[in-house]
Curated annotation (Swiss-Prot):
InterPro entries xref list: Alkaline_phosphatase_core_sf (IPR017850), BPG-indep_PGM_N (IPR011258), Metalloenzyme (IPR006124), PGAM_B_sf (IPR036646), Pgm_bpd_ind (IPR005995)
One example of a Gene Ontology biological process annotation: glucose catabolic process
Pathway: Carbohydrate degradation; glycolysis; pyruvate from D-glyceraldehyde 3-phosphate: step 3/5
Role this protein plays: Catalyzes the interconversion of 2-phosphoglycerate and 3-phosphoglycerate.
One Pfam short name: Metalloenzyme
Cofactor(s), by name: Mn(2+)
Species name: Pseudoalteromonas atlantica (strain T6c / ATCC BAA-1087)
Binding site for substrate: 125, 155-156, 187, 193, 259-262, 333
Protein name, UniProt field: 2,3-bisphosphoglycerate-independent phosphoglycerate mutase
Record note on cofactor: Binds 2 manganese ions per subunit.
């Protein structure tokens, strides 16, 4: 029988930032006896998870994709957001071969260029400036028909904040003298990632067919009507603006979201002829479907900014040294502990196993703030006790998923549920003589309302995140970032870190 392994577990509490001010702070208000005890008894510090420390523009809040890429890479990774923004500033964006050649194909046939994406200054899944640059590129290439299909945010931005981006889009069209916003739909429908195809179908039908729940004269009227129905930006029902502009054979469609996880589902019915998750009707024979970045290897479409290969990320380094690893989370964050943590690689490494716990099927997670954390912990504890794994990467989605709802009381419950689970995990790790690192990918639940506007604060924050180490005797340094976490794990495992990992261990073993 093989010897049991002394597991090193990385527990990522999604959306769990540190904020001294307890006002509207669900984490501070939650009863968290386990983490309170760990703060008193174990090595702990605060680390950075936002801005330039994770490869984002200075001051930009962190997010789950960026967080997990940095956690797994062991180096600061230049993010797609920054990459595209820089290309626009340099002018390279307007010469991008994939964008230019595919837009030109439609223009030569006197066909329309459709642009879809999250029209938001949020910077998590997209940025409105990227969308405006794409509209300008299409106009510059000579497109006479440019249609914007705007997804509304209200999740990474205040719940009712779409007016300014919509007005800015109208201004761009006015200045160019061509194009218009054709449809509006909340991201709840257009950006699902949990196979809720009934939602995606509604978004697809309004974008592709011009079939919405409502028809209005202009975007602002549509938005005001949505608010009068008590629908915040995120939940706005599919709305057609003016004369419908359905997508036709020969048209080009450019998807301007740069983050992959919530872009995959809505892409598929446009790309796959034999798509069958809902009845989409006649397949549209597009001249091109272009992804801003690669959403998945399985989506057969060109990417304007394909992934930059990351060599010797944590998963690869472990596999190359004959180590075993487990990735485990609920559906909502499964892509993060697998695809993103592996630096954009879908496939399993040698010695890697994965456990997916389905997230609860509820409309919004404030209805079940504990989500399926108990089942997740059952499987996680079982894996630790099995002695099979050298390394375990686990994500608890609660702080982020419930934080995004803006429901303070539910967020408190979510944090309490996670604390209880952490208690079980720590006990299991202690039993097997392993090490446990507990941290977060970004903040969220520590700020649930905006003091200035009085609105719910549903977005991430730029706060530092906590970092605890349970296990061998260590001391911690200050000034760490997410990219220092993989080197910390390797240090605790007694392994060298690859040259590509430029991060430094946050804790040092005390001899």
């Amino acid at each position: 029988m093989s010897q049991s392994k002394k597991t090193v577990a990385l527990i990522i509490m999604d959306g769990w930032g540190h904020r001294e001010d307890t006002t509207n702070n669900a984490i501070a208000h939650a009863k968290t006896p386990v983490l309170d005890r760990l703060t008193k008894e174990t090595t702990n510090t605060l680390i950075s998870a936002s801005g330039m420390d994770v490869g984002l523009p200075g001051g930009q809040m962190g997010n789950s994709e960026v967080g997990h890429v940095n956690l797994g890479a062991g180096r600061v990774v230049y993010q797609d957001f920054t990459r595209v923004t820089k290309a626009i500033e340099d002018g390279d964006f307007f010469e991008n071969e994939v964008l230019v050649s595919n837009v030109d194909k439609a223009i030569k046939q006197d066909k329309a260029v459709h642009i879809m994406g999250l029209l938001s200054p949020g910077g998590v899944h997209s940025h409105q400036d990227h969308i405006f640059a794409m509209i300008k590129l299409a106009a510059k290439r000579g497109a006479k028909k440019i249609f914007l299909h705007a997804f509304l945010d209200g999740r990474d931005t205040p719940p009712r904040s779409a007016k300014a981006p919509l007005e800015a889009a109208d201004k761009v069209f006015e200045e160019l003298g061509v194009g218009k916003t054709a449809t509006l739909v909340g991201r709840y429908y257009a950006m699902d990632r949990d196979s809720r195809w009934d939602r995606v179908e509604k978004a697809y039908k309004v974008i592709a067919k011009g079939e919405g729940a409502f028809n209005v004269a202009c975007a602002i009227e549509g938005l005001e009507n949505s608010y009068s129905r008590d629908e915040n930006d995120e939940f706005m029902q599919p709305t057609v603006i003016g004369d419908a502009a359905p997508i036709e054979d020969g048209d080009a469609l450019v998807f301007m979201n740069f983050r992959a996880d919530r872009a995959r589902e809505i892409s598929r019915p446009f790309v796959e002829k034999d798509f069958s998750d809902f009845e989409k009707g006649e397949h549209i024979d597009l001249s091109a479907f272009v992804m801003l970045t690669q959403y998945a290897e399985s989506i057969d479409a060109p990417a304007a900014y394909p992934p930059v290969a990351l060599v010797n990320v944590m998963g690869e380094w472990l596999a190359n040294h004959g180590k075993t690893q487990l990735r485990i989370s609920e559906t909502e964050k499964f892509a993060h502990v697998t695809f993103f943590y592996s630096g954009g690689k879908e496939d399993l490494y040698e010695g890697e196993e994965r456990i997916l716990i389905p997230s609860p099927k509820v409309a919004t997670y404030d209805l079940q703030p504990e989500m399926n954390s108990t089942e997740l912990t059952d499987k996680l504890v079982e894996a630790i006790e099995s002695g099979k794994f050298d390394a375990i990467i686990c994500n608890y989605p609660n702080g982020d998923m419930v934080g995004h709802t803006g429901n303070f009381d539910a967020a408190v419950k979510a944090c309490e549920a996670v604390d209880t689970c952490i208690g079980r995990v720590v006990e299991a790790i202690k039993k097997v003589g392993g090490d446990c690192l507990i941290t977060a990918d970004h903040g969220n639940a520590e700020k649930m309302a905006d003091e200035t506007t009085g609105q719910a604060h549903t977005a991430h924050t730029s706060e530092l995140v906590p970092f605890w180490h349970v296990g061998q005797k260590t001391t911690a340094r200050s000034g760490g970032t997410l990219s220092d976490v993989a080197p910390t794990m390797l240090h605790l495992m007694g392994m060298e870190q690859p040259a590509e990992m430029t991060g430094k261990p946050i804790v040092t073993l005390v001899k």
